Amino acid sequence: MDTSSINAQSIFDDNAAALKLSWLTGHEGWERGFSAETVATATSSADLVGHLNLIHPNRIQVLGEAETNYYQRQSDEDRSRHMAELIALEPPFLVVAGGVAAPPELVLRCTRSSTPLFTTPMSPAAVIDSLRLYMSRILAPRATLHGVFLDILGMGVLLTGDSGLGKSELGLELISRGHGLVADDAVDFVRLGPDFVEGRCPPLLQNLLEVRGLGLLDIKTIFGETAVRRKMKLKLIVQLVRRPDGEFQRLPLESQTVDVLGLPISKVTIQVAAGRNLAVLVEAAVRNTILQLRGIDTLRDFMDRQRLAMQDPDSQFPGKLI
């Protein structure tokens, strides 16, 4: 991932209001950030933000009352040495939290070395938690996929398929049936956790759906506020096909999945043909997926019934025809 756009200035701009940050000194170092190597070797955002620790040179260092009290108890020689070590590590920036006053020597050294120094009245724990969450989102793996992303029965569903199959028309019909649009054509996905992928709409395409023959439709204006969603977790991919290929099975014994950002996502394949009610089929696929997530597998139940019937036909069919 390109980390050049992640610097002290961008982090300050994105978090100043929420964290009540003030930029005390070191404005010349606004371009300071994380190297690609630092980001690549970090196991999580916890490696990038934390309390004052000289062992982690590239971490955003947060100083609170405990750290400043410890500093005050040191001799002048130790104070100078610790401050010199801290600045020499070239952290992206420093934060003095908890409403405590920044030590004068720290302010002086940050000014001389162009090290950004922020202050905030918020507690160090709150600052660290917020910045870790922010860094997790900024540095999370992401990808853009083609399709129509919808909220169907509370589940994030991505409609995919070749151009001209009617994905947008199907999306429009599903919206008219009370479901919500997240994004059309291009969907930005980001993996924010170990077990979920979140999808959003690019700002340029917000609330818009393109339908052939009608052009661009503003779904929010036409159907109202409840017809659009800001984001959804991706749980199901519905692939539309003109005709089934050689691998298509009417009763697949194993669930199909698609790898999205390293996470397997359930997938169903629906053939597009004249007379088929695709909206009903998609809704049924979503309902079936919800049951599967709850541990209810209809196909497995049927196979169990079949096995029992083969073992003891009389118990399953007491009224056997003669």
From Swiss-Prot:
Residues annotated as catalytic: H146, K167, D185 (proton acceptor), R250
Kinase is among the record's keywords: yes
GO MF terms held by the record: ATP binding; magnesium ion binding; phosphorelay sensor kinase activity; protein serine/threonine kinase activity; protein serine/threonine/tyrosine kinase activity
Cited function: Catalyzes the ATP- as well as the pyrophosphate-dependent phosphorylation of a specific serine residue in HPr, a phosphocarrier protein of the phosphoenolpyruvate-dependent sugar phosphotransferase system (PTS). HprK/P also catalyzes the pyrophosphate-producing, inorganic phosphate-dependent dephosphorylation (phosphorolysis) of seryl-phosphorylated HPr (P-Ser-HPr).
Family from the record: Belongs to the HPrK/P family.
Note: Both phosphorylation and phosphorolysis are carried out by the same active site and suggest a common mechanism for both reactions.
Protein name: HPr kinase/phosphorylase
Annotated source species: Paraburkholderia phymatum (strain DSM 17167 / CIP 108236 / LMG 21445 / STM815)
Gene: hprK
